[in-house]
Amino acid sequence: STTSLADLFFFMNNQFSMFFPMVLFILIGSLFYQEYKNKTYINWITYGFSKKKLFLSKVTVSVVIGICFAAVLFIAFGLLVAILNGAGRLTGGIALFLKLAIGFGIEAGVVVFVTTCLGAIVINLSRNIIVTSVVGVIYGFVSCLFIGSERGFVIPGSFAYRVSMFFSDKSTYYEVPISATIGGCISIVFCFIVLFL
């Protein structure tokens, strides 16, 4: 039997939107936790190095790893699409795949940046990898809970998911698209302002 590219992307993207934020929380938590566990953070600030530089360097490393990981996931998805397409078991062309790539890129960018910054704040406030991991799991579930809500655009991960799915099926976007788009963009900007203060 054949399946559509849009359905396959829907399945993959649902898994991505739930589990990827959890992975990012654990990643950024681990990067900072190593500093606290090895007491290298104390050395860093005792020698007069900027705490802000340390924070931004860890966030940058996590963002780069997160973007690379998301790219690898989409490349693996592309290989699966190529295999299924070659076997004649997939409907949907290259034009749809390219649109999905744009949508996924937008979603991954928003999720990586917002989640990494949020995770960095949680680990620096708690200094506990378990607390950070639990908050990451909660954030992943909360993002997924708001995906279907018409007010879900206030959660950046939920908004990014709906934007991504718009490239697959326009009917999955918000009923009031202009207000939701403006609100979602404002929520992302607001998150960045709060996270970088």
Descriptions of predicted regions:
Residues F16, F32, I45-T46, R151, ...:
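Short N-terminal micro-motifs specific to bacterial/archaeal maturation
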Residues S1-F11, S133-L197:
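Terminal transmembrane helical anchor/hairpin motif
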Residues S1-I26, L56-L125, F166-G183:
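Secretory targeting signals
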Residues T46, C117, V134:
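Short glycine/serine/threonine-biased micro-segments
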Residues L31-V64:
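Helix-loop-helix units of permease transmembrane domains in multi-pass membrane transporters
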Residues Y33-Y36, T40, L80-G92, S126, ...:
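Membrane-interfacial segments
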Residues F20-Y36, Y41, F113-V131, S187-L197:
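Transmembrane alpha-helical segments in integral membrane proteins
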